[in-house]
Amino acid sequence: MEIKAEEISEIIRKQIKEYGTEVAVAETGTIISIGDGIARIHGLDKAMAGELLEFPGGITGMVLNLEEDNVGAAILGEFSEIKEGDSVKLTGKIVEVPVGPALIGRVVDAIGNPIDGLGPINTDTFGKVEVKAPGIVKRKSVHQPMQTGLKAIDSMVPIGRGQRELIIGDRQTGKTAVAIDTIINQKGGDVVCIYVAIGQKRSTVAQVVSKLKEHGAMDYTIVVAATASEPAPLQFIAPYTGVTMGEFFRDSGKHALIIYDDLSKQAVAYRQLSLLLRRPPGREAYPGDVFYLHSRLLERACKVSDDCGAGSLTALPVIETQAGDVSAYIPTNVISITDGQIYLESDLFYSGVRPAINVGLSVSRVGGSAQVKAMKQVAGTLRLALAQYREMAAFAQFGSDLDKATQMQLARGARLVEILKQPQYRPIPNEKQVLIIFAANNGFVDDYPIGSLGRYETELYAFFDSRKATLLGELRDKKAIDDAMKGEIIASLEEFKKEFTA
C-alpha cells in the first residue's frame, strides 16, 4: 500500500480548517453544604444576586445570599440527588420562565414546566421572574370595571382593572370560592386569568382545575401550582412566575387577572428559606424584608397608560387569618399594600350568608371610579342600609317593643341580606344584578317572606330574559339608568309582581 504525501497533506489541511478555536469557559463552584432546599457553594466569586445556577442532573437553583467566602442558593426542584462536593455552574442569566399565549389552558409548576401531561409548551418567549414594577409615568388610574359576577362585591366593593384587592378571612370561609367565581365570570370576555396555588394540597388544586374545565374557564386560564409537597423555594417563587406570565399580557395591551392563593403560605416558605440562610429573624420570626417580598410582587399589578398599550393586570391576593385576627404581621402588611380588602367572616358563613362578606370591614379604595354607572345608581345606599341594619339588629335583640319604622328597617335589611346571597359557581351578569338590587331597594320584595326571595330572583331573571330582553339589552349597553328607563323597569317589576306568588 502506497502512502501519497499529497493525500496526507490534504487530510491535515482539512483537519486544520475544521478545528474550532472556541473555548467554553464556565465558572464553577463546589457545594460545601446542602439541606432543606438550600445549598452553600464555594468558588462562585462572580455570582449575581438572583442568578440562575445549574446543578448536576439538570436541576436549577437561584442565588439568594452573597457572602464573603460562599454563596447561599435555593434549589428550584428535587434536591435529594444533589450532594456535598458536586460542582455547580453559573449560567450568567437571571431566572426566567416561559410566557405567552401558548400557556393558556395549561397547568405548570413554579418554574413554568408543564405538569398536566399534555406535552411540552411551544413558546420561544421567556420573561424574567424578578423585574421592576412599571414607574409612575407608565401608569394610569383605575377606571374600567373588573366584574366578579358576585352581587355583594360588584355592588359594594367594586373592583377595577389594574386594582389589587385583598381577599382575607379565616380558613373555610369561601376565599377561594370568590376567586374561582371571578375567573368563571370572565367567560366570553377579554381577560386572561392566572391562578397561582401556593402550598395547597394537590387534591385541592386538581379540584379547582376540574371545576374550571367544567365551566369552560380553562380556555382562558393558566394554573401555576406549587403544592404543599414542593420544596419551600418553589412555593416562594411561584407567585413571581405567575405575575411574569400576567405581565406579558399586560404589556401586550391586553387585560389579565391573577389570583395568589394564598400569600400567607408564600410568607411561611420565605421565612423558612431566610432562617435556613441564617438571615436575622424579626417579628413572628419573619425576616425584615417580608414586606418587600409582597410589595414588589403586588406593585407589578397595575393599569398601564394609553401610551404604553393601555393593558392591565388585576391582582386578587388571598390571605388566611387565624381566628379572625387581621392585626397579625402578614395581614396588616398586605392590607397596607393593596387597594382595599374583601373581609370574609366565619360567623356569617356558618349562618348561611354566602359569600360571607362583612360589609363594614370590606372596602375598595379605588374601585368606585371603575364601577358601572347603573350599579352606582342603584347600590349607592346599599352599604349604609346594611350597616344600619346590622347595628339595629344587634340592638333589637334586647328590646321586643320596637316602633314601626324600626321594624320596617329590620325587615328591609333582612331582605337585602337575603338578596345578596348567591350560590357558588353561579356568577350573575351586571345588568341582572342591577335589576334585583333595584327591586330590593324600591320595596318590591318587602311583601314576600324571606324564604321565597331566592325563587323570586330566579323567576325575575327568567321573566326579563323572555319578555323584557330589549330592556335588559338596553341596560347592558347603556350601563346607566335614565328617567325613561327607570319608569320602564318599575313598570316591568309591577307586571312581574302580579304574576309572582310567594
UniProtKB/Swiss-Prot annotation:
SUPFAM superfamilies: C-terminal domain of alpha and beta subunits of F1 ATP synthase, N-terminal domain of alpha and beta subunits of F1 ATP synthase, P-loop containing nucleoside triphosphate hydrolases. One of its GO terms (cellular component) is plasma membrane. It catalyses: ATP + H2O + 4 H(+)(in) = ADP + phosphate + 5 H(+)(out). The gene is atpA. Pfam families: ATP-synt_ab, ATP-synt_ab_C, ATP-synt_ab_N. HAMAP family: ATP_synth_alpha_bact. This is ATP synthase subunit alpha. The lineage of its organism: Bacteria, Pseudomonadati, Thermodesulfobacteriota, Desulfuromonadia, Geobacterales. F-type ATPases have 2 components, CF(1) - the catalytic core - and CF(0) - the membrane proton channel. CF(1) has five subunits: alpha(3), beta(3), gamma(1), delta(1), epsilon(1). CF(0) has three main subunits: a(1), b(2) and c(9-12). The alpha and beta chains form an alternating ring which encloses part of the gamma chain. CF(1) is attached to CF(0) by a central stalk formed by the gamma and epsilon chains, while a peripheral stalk is formed by the delta and b chains. It is found in: Cell inner membrane. Belongs to the ATPase alpha/beta chains family. Disulfide bonds: none annotated. It comes from Citrifermentans bemidjiense (strain ATCC BAA-1014 / DSM 16622 / JCM 12645 / Bem) (Geobacter bemidjiensis).
